[in-house]
């Protein structure tokens, strides 16, 4: 995921690589996502018209309602969708399975030991993998 740049899209296309840009207005660090659900969905449709067939959406970093955005986006967009940002609990993992995106990413929740408080990064990752395997 990164902001959409036509030059990046063209370069990756020339080298047979997939490009999964962010959609909506993304800013800050950690990143936040702004825009109405309709604007974000339209942004994806506009990018699909340029040949983009996969997206990285920072749904839980949305300034309004991340879960609602994720549900509406995945229902409206016929493309690979990876949900990124703040997937930091078993409840949110369950929600990912319910929404059904192509995938989701997880980062800081593993470093901050959200799943095994006294565990290592590897132990936290293993706890998530074990949990998901049972789904």
Feature-to-residue mapping (PLM):
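Charged helix-capping and loop-helix junction motifs
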Residues: 34-42, 65-71, 118-124
């Amino acid at each position: 995921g990164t902001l959409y740049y036509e030059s990046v899209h063209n370069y990756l296309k020339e080298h047979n690589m997939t490009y999964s840009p962010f959609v909506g207005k993304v800013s800050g660090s950690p990143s936040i996502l702004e825009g109405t659900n309709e604007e974000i969905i339209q942004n994806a449709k506009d990018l699909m018209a340029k040949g983009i067939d996969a997206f990285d959406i920072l749904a839980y970093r949305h300034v309004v309602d991340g879960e609602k955005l994720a549900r509406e986006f995945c229902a409206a967009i016929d493309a690979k969708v990876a949900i990124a940002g703040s997937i930091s609990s078993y409840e949110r993992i369950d929600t990912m399975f319910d929404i059904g995106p192509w995938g989701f990413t997880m980062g800081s929740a593993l470093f901050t030991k959200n799943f095994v408080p006294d565990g290592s990064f590897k132990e936290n990752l293993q706890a998530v993998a074990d949990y998901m395997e049972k789904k």
